[in-house]
């Protein structure tokens, strides 16, 4: 076993190799502080036939024992990955995926298992570091060293590896990953930071990444690694030459510039089919079928090259826009009659239907994960059905991509939400992607912002998002605004920025190339700001402020604060009182016994108000001389017991009765006055009458209102 240690940026990094998981192609145990992960990398012996991508899978396993916890719920064992585990897996996947050879077709699985956590150093950061080492010490073809760092902005200063307390005060919470040469991945949220602040954070993060990579280089120098030789399949020279000759550059250009995603896609498919059939006729169906994946790859390369040259040489994009142009935008609100808020945002051929649902405090998402416990009052769920891209696929649960896109949009919007004291509702946004041709996550931000205002949620301002792209060639560097799906696929960078008029609230970047300079990043950020401000104007033109009232179909929620020591009075023995209130007034009641906050929820404001009035009555301090209309609950030879308010019963002694005890019935209503409260809080009552002629002890009998009297 070999161990390496180094202090970097005030954190101790420790790496162990050769002790555990020796059957994997590569394995390390990496530790920062007390957060420890085991990262393994394994590659299959044979290639997967008939695919045109690198079959990489990254799994992030949370083990509750790492935090000294036992999983909650009925089954005391970890099940399917939590949302945070999926997001952490994506954080590791995105910076390492571009570093595999494009021709690799052997399955590769990277598994990062959290085996200890100190709740200070987040496991995803350690996971990127460990995965990079596991791949580099293995024989798996992998070209690069990566590392990641979390960045905060506290009191105007950039903080690397911020603690949980610092993040609570931080204006920025981003994860930055990269190689020694460039930043390759960014993901995070902000509280309206400026473009210059974001750029400084990225540059400071890259300096830290270089220090971590230097430590990785020291570790890797110990190994004499011989990478597996994966033969790259190529087309026979004769067929490749003929295929290139059959590709007419002008026709390819004309087909690429056909307007409309579907029409363009069909035209390009037809052109490939035409060339394919010519080759089939010349070389035979069997031979060409064997080479079909390679031919598709070659065609894809030609399309990528041609699209990029059109942009560079002609300054025109596939939909005839200039680099800074934004596609036509339309916005609508209030589309659906019964939902609490709705909006349709359409930008070119990308369309998101945003729906807001308002719920009670008990509708909050319960979180019981490795690092977090508690509840979450704002949720955004992103759905990407196959029809949005004109495809047929099985409908299953949400994909990792859907979870990741929803999380990004949620982070973009949460900063503008009102606090719970001002707006005590649980808020859920669902984004239905109805059509997609690039930047559907940023369309989700826009539809979500519109739908929140349509629902009457008092958000402070609109939030909009835009996706940027990059074409990086030797002769030019072109930043593209509001990218199409093809520009994302064949371009060099996907750069998403969301925010308000006053700053950035969410940020995501994936870069496929090295050599992205600070100047280029600054240019992209400033161009994104121009685009964001333009989109925001469209949102404000549609709905400029939240509606004054909530939907009539939204629940009514009213909150009162009581002395926490009196919570038991509302609950009652065995929950008797609160159950009666819920039943009698047709409401839901949520009580926080720590803060004394009581939320009353119902479909009818009058019933909610009546329930609150009754709660106030229950909590009212009872004094000698107070008069109540109470219900007889028990009769004894010495007197009767009368409930004057829920849970508060006093003794009405027979000597204090005006009425003959023999005529009193259980359930009837009596007017009583509090005559005494002893030192144990017990109530003594006397029957009360407005008439001065009625005296206690003078027995009289008369018909009085009783429960169920006819």
Curated annotation (Swiss-Prot):
Domain named S1 motif is located at 625-688
Spell out the residue ranges making up region: Disordered: 688-710
Database matches in InterPro entries: ExoRNase_PH_dom1, ExoRNase_PH_dom2, ExoRNase_PH_dom2_sf, KH_dom, KH_dom_type_1, KH_dom_type_1_sf, NA-bd_OB-fold, PNPase
Q: Which UniProt keywords apply?
A: Cytoplasm, Magnesium, Metal-binding, Nucleotidyltransferase, RNA-binding, Transferase
Required cofactor names: Mg(2+)
One Gene Ontology cellular component annotation?
cytosol
What catalytic activity does the UniProt entry give for this protein?
RNA(n+1) + phosphate = RNA(n) + a ribonucleoside 5'-diphosphate
Query: What's the EC number here?
Result: 2.7.7.8
Disulphide connectivity of cysteines: none
A Gene Ontology biological process annotation?
A: RNA processing
Listed binding positions for Mg(2+) are 488, 494
Q: What residue spans carry the Basic residues bias annotation?
A: 701-710
Q: What is this protein called?
A: Polyribonucleotide nucleotidyltransferase
Q: What is the lineage of its organism?
A: Bacteria, Thermotogati, Thermotogota, Thermotogae, Thermotogales
